[in-house]
Amino acid sequence: MLQALLDSKDFLALTLAHPEQFDSEFSFRLGDHTQVEVWDTGVIVFEPAQNEGKDVVLSCGVHGNETAPIELCNGLIKQLLQQKIIAKQRTLFLIGNPLAINNGTRIIDENMNRLFSGEHSNPPGLVNPERVRAKKLEAYIDRFYTAVADGRQRIHYDLHTAMRASKHEKFAIYPYRPGRAFSGEQIMFLAASGVDTVLFHHEPTTTFSYFSSERYGADAFTIELGKVYPMGQNDMTRFIATHEMFMRLITAKPLELDAFDADKVNLYQVCRVINKHFDDFEFTFATDVENFRSFPKGFVLAREGGQEIKVEHEFESVVFPNAKVPIGNRTVICLIPAVNADVR
């Protein structure tokens, strides 16, 4: 495996050739500047000999059909392995769900991004590939962040693409973080990366980014980088700004960020999450409605169990509507403009 990676510099290809696990860990050096450690399939760490005090996690492929972030991360890994760029921050790349990537599907058995913060081991337990992998990914995050002294900035960008078109092509979800202000610097980093819209979540979740935020105090986000396309069919010119800012972050080049300005970004607050309680749950709007479509107060969003679910605020925007989820799961997130967010 080591020689195959040294020859090809293609970590994604190696991962997909061994989607369940690698037989053993291995490591090697790049020149005199970087120690590279491969912990498992889809798990590679770059440890600079001299680093600038940030511990960066870039994860992708938690959903196997969300290919643009996978190609973006593999491109950065390849540049690092080719020594075209040199890491100056400790960096962990995670390719989340290799089995689903090979399968060309979002999941194998279950939505992995609902299985973190220990949810993977709640009943029925570790019964499918996503649950097993989620537990391993948590362990790799823990190993990476706790291998060095506290006090360093921890960052985790969990990269996705959405199943539908969006009024705002690229957007990020800022996990619930009670007692901690939202970072204006991070929001402006996202804006410089082409991600000009941020949703502030209002409650704990079992997503990957919430896990890193809550457990390790990381500046963590779920980042949606556009729409789902098959591998190799993404227009990577749409990610030039994202690639550039991630490269600057990893190599400790000046980020040259603007000061936080709420007028330069679109900020939303999650006002509620609507879960499914009956099999007959259905939305009243078209199945292909774009993310961030806005509806007025009193509009009937959905019906289930003989009840109507209506818009409660003057206007509410919807993201991730999906009526075809199991009972108990989220069908849609409803948003209102964020006017009093604690951003510093």
Swiss-Prot record:
One of its GO terms (biological process) is arginine catabolic process to succinate. It is an enzyme of class 3 (hydrolase). Zn(2+) binds at H63, E66, H160. It catalyses: N-succinyl-L-glutamate + H2O = L-glutamate + succinate. InterPro entries: AspA/AstE_fam, AstE_AspA_cat, Aste_AspA_hybrid_dom, SuccinylGlu_desuccinylase. Pathway: Amino-acid degradation; L-arginine degradation via AST pathway; L-glutamate and succinate from L-arginine: step 5/5. Binds 1 zinc ion per subunit. The keyword Metal-binding applies. Keywords: Arginine metabolism, Hydrolase, Metal-binding, Zinc. The active site is at E224. GO terms for molecular function: hydrolase activity, acting on ester bonds; succinylglutamate desuccinylase activity; zinc ion binding. Gene3D superfamilies: Zn peptidases. Its EC number is 3.5.1.96. Transforms N(2)-succinylglutamate into succinate and glutamate. Belongs to the AspA/AstE family. Succinylglutamate desuccinylase subfamily. This is Succinylglutamate desuccinylase. It comes from Shewanella baltica (strain OS195).
